[in-house]
Amino acid sequence: MILSEAILNCKNYIDTEEIIHLIFAKRNNGKFLPDSEALVLELTPEEMEMQLSIIAETKCPGFEYFLEFFVLQDFYDDLLKIEEFKSDDKKVGRIIYYAEFDA
């Protein structure tokens, strides 16, 4: 899966009391990009207490934490209301920027 697919399909992942969904992705030349390789991890609340870097090292070496799905879904919903972000490319770009610099 690539990062843009994970972002645009964010509504397909529903967190529960037992499972929390997170995206981990690989950087290309030091940056997250729409075509960066991405993984969706399902973690238990106990696993969420671990440092994210340790989760990445043990469950997906070479990948870095990107965002939790509940954060992504809230931000995605907000973007749907803004005319400037109607295209998928604009939504993906803004979410990547948010994950890199604002989250």
Q: Where does each model-flagged region fall?
A:
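Extended, charge-biased low-complexity segments
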Residues: 1-55
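Amphipathic protein-protein interaction modules
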Residues: 39-100
